[in-house]
Each structure stands twice: as structure tokens, then as C-alpha cells.
């Protein structure tokens, strides 16, 4: 008798809760669809289209089309930035981009340190930061100048990418710059990176 009573309570609870949970679920779906509708109407109005009435299926279809357009635009921007080679297609390119990002971060840290350390000559700081800027410009020119479809390969003179040529090193007062040995550039191991 107790089991039947518990069963009936559980059954009654499910009987009451299931429709209530379903109503809540549908309310959430409808709320999200209304938000999507507002967003899509705003986007389409900006594109010059006028929408009077949208059904739920229309909202979902327009959203899918809009997301596909956004993804295509993003890929187009990425291919124009990387010279037509997608970063996922060529892992060496993403390594070069990662190297540049690390270089920029390191240059920013040098700049902060120069500003924070008292007694550092302004001329020395200016010269060092302009040298780092010139090297960054060199790094940005190396990869995008490749023709589309040509695989990115390490140049014959790897040391030009790693260290500045000796003529530029001579202009620095510190004299701490020296060309990398040719054996280091020909090793098959991975290049050390500061990040």
C-alpha cells in the first residue's frame, strides 16, 4: 500500500512537472528566437533589406546565412593579412606569426623596462626602440611577400631573420649584437622562443 502511494505521488509529480518543464523550455527557446530576430532585423536593416515578418524557421535560416557570411569575411580578412595563405594550411606561417607576436611582446617589455629604470639615456632608449621597430618591420615583410601557393620554407640565410646584419650591429653603442653562428641555423631541432 505504501509503495502504491509513493508510486502515485511520483507519478503525480511527474504528471505536473513534465508540462511545466516543457513550458519553461519552450519559453527559453522563444526568448532566444526573439533575441535572434531582433539582432537579425537590425543586421539586415543595416544591409539595406526591409523585413516585415519572420517566422521561427526564417529566423534560424537567416541566422545561419549571416553566420556563414561572417565566417567567409573573417577567412577573407585572414587570407589578405597572410598573403593568401591560410594560417591553418601552413603551420610554418603560424609559427612565424607566433614569433612576431612574441617579438612585439618582448619589445613592449623592453620599452616598459627602459621607462621604469632611472638613469637610462633617452638617446639609448630611442636608438634601441627604433632598432627593434626596424627589425619588426623586417619580420613583417619576410612572410607576406611570398607568392600565393608557394610553401613557406626556411631561407638559405636563416641568421638574417634571427640577428641583424653586422652593419646594423656596429651602429649600436652596446656592441652586444653579434651574428649567429651558421651551425645554429642548420640544426634540425626546434628554434628556442622566449614564450
UniProtKB/Swiss-Prot annotation:
Motif window: WRPW motif: 192-195
Main location: nucleus
Keywords: Developmental protein, Differentiation, DNA-binding, Neurogenesis, Notch signaling pathway, Nucleus, Transcription, Transcription regulation
Cellular compartment(s): Nucleus
Phenotype when changing residue 170 to G: In strain: Oregon-R, NVIII-1, NVIII-18, NVIII-2, NVIII-22, NVIII-24, NVIII-28, NVIII-41, NVIII-42, NVIII-46, NVIII-5, NVIII-9, NVIII-m11, NVIII-m12, NVIII-m13, NVIII-m15 and NVIII-m19
Keyword Ubl conjugation tagged: no
Bilayer-spanning residue ranges: none
Keyword Transcription: yes
A UniProt-annotated Pfam family: HLH
Residues covered by region (Disordered): 163-195
GO MF: DNA-binding transcription factor activity; DNA-binding transcription repressor activity, RNA polymerase II-specific; protein dimerization activity; RNA polymerase II cis-regulatory region sequence-specific DNA binding; sequence-specific DNA binding; sequence-specific double-stranded DNA binding
Orange domain: residues covered: 99-132
Domain bHLH: 13-70
One of the GO biological process terms: nervous system development
Subunit structure, as described in the record: Transcription repression requires formation of a complex with a corepressor protein (Groucho).
Record note on domains: Has a particular type of basic domain (presence of a helix-interrupting proline) that binds to the N-box (CACNAG), rather than the canonical E-box (CANNTG). The C-terminal WRPW motif is a transcriptional repression domain necessary for the interaction with Groucho, a transcriptional corepressor recruited to specific target DNA by Hairy-related proteins.
Protein name per UniProt: Enhancer of split mbeta protein
Annotated organism of origin: Drosophila melanogaster
Gene name of the encoded protein: E(spl)mbeta-HLH
